[in-house]
A protein has these predicted regions:
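Catalytic cores of carbohydrate-active enzymes across secretory and cytosolic contexts
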Residues: 1-230
């Protein structure tokens, strides 16, 4: 006699991301926070600061983390604040008008590749002048309405924080980035699965997860090799 056994006790691991919810009236803030357009738009930065000035300073001016940590009570206060809600609505309309402009099809499309991009300290994927130049190039491409796609890397630890010891020696402190709390989003394929690209390297295949950072009108695709497939 054969007995068919189902392995019901085997664990089924799934990724679970816990995020705080926003009231319907504030949903547009999440879209704004996940587009780095706010980096060079002072009205947007001032708005995020005014949502909670103390918290804004604590999260080092990262709007994604700011919204994640806003208290329920503060969210309710914002919704009831007519002046603040008017600013939110006006800013979102300004953002949508900016984003709805179609790329100039009379100019050639551009693919831009760089090892680092300096756009904001909330996205630690740069360390020096090369990154700052690349970041400015992408922002200018967005404002100039260039049909451009940029590609780079998403580093788990990014650059280090530098301090000095009592003896004057450099101390490097590495802090891991939580990709769910910075202005990037995972890219999915047509089947709804996280997109992964395979890159041949000597005798191996390197598997890179794909993320995207929205820099105004420009998509910045970031490859992340810090995963269990490697």
């Amino acid at each position: 006699m054969k007995i068919k056994a189902d392995y019901v006790n085997e664990p089924q691991w799934r990724q679970l991301v816990v995020k705080s919810s926003l009231p319907e009236e504030l949903k547009c803030l999440d879209e704004l926070a996940h587009n780095l357009w706010w980096v060079w738009n002072f009205e947007a930065r001032d708005l995020f600061r005014d949502l909670d000035p103390k918290l804004y300073s604590e999260v080092k001016h990262n709007p994604v983390l700011l919204l994640e940590r806003l208290s329920y009570e503060r969210k309710e206060e914002i919704v009831k604040d007519k002046a603040l809600m008017k600013r939110i609505k006006a800013l979102y309309e300004q953002f949508r008008a900016y984003m709805d402009v179609k790329p100039d099809s009379t100019r050639p499309s551009v693919a831009y590749f760089c090892m680092e991009y300096g756009i904001h300290s909330a996205l630690k994927i740069y360390s020096g002048g090369l990154g700052m130049l690349a970041g400015d190039y992408v922002k200018e491409a967005s404002d100039s309405n260039v049909d451009m796609c940029a590609v780079g890397f998403l580093y788990r630890f990014g650059y280090f924080t530098q301090t000095l010891s009592m003896e004057g020696q450099q101390i490097a402190k590495y802090e891991a980035q939580n990709f769910n709390s910075i202005p990037v989003e995972r890219v999915y394929d047509n089947n709804g699965n996280p997109m992964v690209v395979d890159v041949p390297y000597t005798n191996y295949q390197v598997h890179a997860s794909v993320w995207v950072a929205n820099v105004g009108r420009v998509k910045l695709y970031l490859l992340d090799t810090d995963n269990e497939m490697n």
